[in-house]
């Protein structure tokens, strides 16, 4: 008696464009804190909204920040080598949209109150937390640069609910 034959058909591999969209849809389901990353110095004033920010280590305090090379903030961050990660809280949705779009740089900063800590990068006065950093190293990450940043000063505000971005919408937790 002969064993029955089984025909296995592998699913068609997605095209590069389909894979890219599939990946973007998956990343939309990965909730993340909403941050405004700012810089100022010889390269100019700039800022952008980011969710691709995470802790690397606490010894010494180090952050990872991903920055798209096509971002209008890229030349300034690259030249200044300082930045501040300002973690947003409930009520900052409009500010996030300003920094996430094509709004001219000075109009972005007019929407809030700012100060500075050690590096001179703008610190959002009512951010949940602000992490003032010096860029220590930069690695290639496809369309983005991966910035490894030494945290040199921290400002925390009490209370507030963190603003996260999940499923292409803002949520407070």
From Swiss-Prot:
Q: Which Pfam families match?
A: Flavin_Reduct
Q: Which family does it belong to?
A: Belongs to the non-flavoprotein flavin reductase family. RutF subfamily.
Q: Which reaction does it catalyse?
A: FMNH2 + NAD(+) = FMN + NADH + 2 H(+)
**A biological-process GO annotation:** nitrogen utilization
Quote the SUPFAM superfamilies the UniProt record gives.
FMN-binding split barrel (SSF50475)
What is the role of this chain? Catalyzes the reduction of FMN to FMNH2 which is used to reduce pyrimidine by RutA via the Rut pathway.
What taxonomic classification does the UniProt entry list for its organism? Answer: Bacteria, Pseudomonadati, Pseudomonadota, Alphaproteobacteria, Hyphomicrobiales
Gene3D superfamilies linked? Electron Transport, Fmn-binding Protein, Chain A
Question: EC number(s) per UniProt?
Answer: 1.5.1.42
Gene source species: Rhizobium rhizogenes (strain K84 / ATCC BAA-868) (Agrobacterium radiobacter)
- What is the primary gene name for this protein? rutF2
**Listed GO molecular functions?**
FMN binding; FMN reductase (NADH) activity; FMN reductase [NAD(P)H] activity; riboflavin reductase (NADPH) activity
Q: Which UniProt keywords apply?
A: Flavoprotein, FMN, NAD, Oxidoreductase
**Name this protein carries in UniProt:** FMN reductase (NADH) RutF 2
């Amino acid at each position: 008696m002969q064993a029955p034959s089984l025909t296995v058909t592998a699913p068609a591999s997605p095209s590069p464009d389909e894979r890219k969209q599939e990946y973007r849809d998956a990343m939309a389901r990965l909730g993340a804190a909403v941050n405004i990353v700012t810089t100022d110095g010889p390269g100019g004033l700039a800022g952008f909204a980011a969710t691709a920010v995470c802790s690397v280590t606490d010894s010494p305090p180090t952050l990872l920040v991903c920055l798209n090379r096509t971002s209008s903030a890229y030349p300034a961050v690259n030249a200044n080598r300082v930045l501040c990660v300002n973690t947003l809280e409930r009520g900052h949705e409009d500010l996030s949209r300003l920094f996430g779009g094509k709004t001219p740089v000075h109009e972005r900063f007019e929407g809030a109150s700012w100060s500075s800590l050690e590096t001179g990068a703008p610190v959002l006065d009512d951010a949940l937390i602000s992490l003032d950093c010096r860029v220590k190293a930069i690695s290639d990450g496809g369309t983005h640069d991966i910035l490894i940043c030494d945290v040199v000063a921290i400002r925390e505000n009490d209370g507030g609910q963190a603003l996260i971005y999940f499923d292409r919408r803002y949520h407070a937790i």
